[in-house]
Amino acid sequence: TPHSPPMEALNAKVADAATKSIVHYSFYFGATTTNPDIVPTLDKNRVCGVKLFMGASTGNMLVDRMEVLRKVFANAGILIAAHCEEQSIISANTTAFKEKYGEDPDIKYHPQIRSAEACVYSSSLAIRLAKENNARLHILHISTAQELDLFEDKPLSEKKITAEACVSHLYFYDKDYEALKGHIKCNPSIKTLEDRNALRKALSTNRIDVIQSLIHITEPTRPEPI
């Protein structure tokens, strides 16, 4: 619930799960630019990690100020799960594509606006901060071949920095926008065939540690049920 204050939202989720869940559960604490001082106070037995959006996201959860990022990485005694896209690159691309194609550029340009460059830059920064602070980092939904080179090909038990791939990035590539339009619009964007194939190949190595089954689709409308 990004629109709620993170601690309030966390408490609400825990209370709701307590009445409904039949399995063990835990939730992320959502880091924002205004709450990094709460991070070191989190109960490790209650919170599974800190969710960090290093790029455009929903509501107030974008964290793009370096001093805040440094605080989070220095003080988090639990896992940091990071969505990595560099906002300044996305903003510049958005402006350029709107100037060229109008206020609402075609969906096929989505992977060029939310580009591979934005992902690689942000993931590289997250990994650098994690190494500087000996933090436990998990980078969510890797979408480019270049990012794979940032991760070590060794057993999970020997790593503090891990990565995941999402089914949407493993299945689709940019040419699919022509037929599927906004139904495959997600962040990070679905990119090239080369990126998709590199992600698939990485599944047989130790560079990808987790396969995520679902990523939020950003298209605001859905087709009616048949």
Feature-to-residue mapping (PLM):
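A glycine-rich helix N-cap at a beta->alpha junction
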Residues: D16-G30
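Alpha-helix N-cap/helix-start motif
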Residues: H3-P6, L62, E147, I226
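Metal-associated gating/positioning segment near the N- to mid-region
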Residues: T1-K20
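Single conserved hydrophobic/aromatic residue that forms the stacking wall/gate
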Residues: I215-I226
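Histidine/acidic residue-rich metal-binding segments in metalloenzymes
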Residues: D37-I211
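Active-site neighborhood of phospho(di)ester-bond hydrolases with catalytic His/Asp-centered motifs
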Residues: T1, F27-F29, L140, I211-S213
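Active-site beta->alpha loop and helix N-cap motifs at the rims of alpha/beta catalytic domains
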Residues: A31-P36
